């Protein structure tokens, strides 16, 4: 079992870092999944709940969280973590994995850490009982340099008049004085591309979104081309829907990165 746990963690890191990302399809049974956080081959839903868990642990509050991962065959494997009185208990549940051990194994661990760099993020239990002393329960890779293709088009504002477009290499900005700023041959710097790609991955941009409608016309349009996959979204700035909030935060991050460049280059 310990060997399989290590192999599973390694396989997840390979899948997350693969340079040929495709649109994420939900494995059979995903909709019935009642885990707090769902990891489908590196596409993670409800990642914010991991940070909520970390926050409560740091505040010494007794708390628990359930994380599900999916095998290539579509079977869920669960990491169920409980924090009680300064100690962590991990239940590694493979009872629904047709090709696994089909049992629940319990580990006790000393610490829980979040590690974040420019290209990867992981949540790790450390000081665990048994042969495996460190167990990654979530691993995310967002190294844009490993992608064969990453381009996007973002439209926003009144009538979606503003546009950040790396597909057609153009930038359009409404100056709010009756004039429009247009930049041709627009390109992002590598550092900017990395920041935006990281934000997209952490926003789980490849997953299916369930947007609420709170305005007559959508405030945002986003098209993403990543290797062989294409995703398109229209949504409004609705604060009562989690997907709307996450994608609006993503759009605002992209806008802020580009606006910072324009100000620094004195192009406005």
Where are the predicted features?
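Detector for Asparagine
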Residues: 33-34, 46, 58, 62, ...
């Amino acid at each position: 079992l310990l060997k399989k746990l290590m192999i599973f963690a390694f396989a997840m890191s390979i899948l997350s870092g693969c340079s040929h990302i495709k649109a994420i399809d939900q494995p059979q049974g995903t909709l019935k999944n009642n885990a707090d956080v769902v990891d489908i081959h590196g596409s993670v839903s409800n990642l914010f709940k991991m940070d909520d868990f970390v926050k409560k642990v740091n505040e010494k509050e007794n708390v628990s969280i359930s994380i599900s991962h999916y095998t290539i065959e579509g079977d869920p494997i669960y990491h169920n973590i409980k924090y009680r009185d300064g100690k962590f208990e991990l239940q590694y549940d493979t009872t629904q994995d047709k090709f696994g051990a089909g049992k629940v194994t319990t580990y006790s661990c000393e610490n829980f850490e979040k590690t974040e760099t420019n290209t990867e993020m992981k949540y790790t239990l450390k000081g665990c009982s048994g042969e495996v002393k460190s167990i990654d329960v979530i691993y995310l890779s967002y190294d844009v340099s490993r992608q064969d293709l990453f381009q996007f088009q973002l439209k926003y504002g009144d009538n979606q008049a503003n546009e950040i477009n790396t597909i057609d290499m153009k930038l359009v900005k409404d100056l709010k004085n009756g004039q429009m700023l247009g930049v041709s041959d627009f390109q992002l710097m590598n550092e900017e591309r990395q920041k935006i790609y990281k934000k997209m991955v952490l926003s789980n941009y490849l997953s299916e979104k369930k947007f609420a409608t709170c305005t007559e016309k959508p405030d945002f349009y986003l098209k993403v081309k990543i290797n062989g996959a294409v995703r398109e979204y229209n949504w409004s700035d609705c604060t009562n829907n989690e997907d709307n909030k996450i994608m609006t935060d993503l759009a605002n991050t992209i806008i802020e990165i580009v606006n910072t460049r324009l100000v620094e280059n004195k192009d406005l």
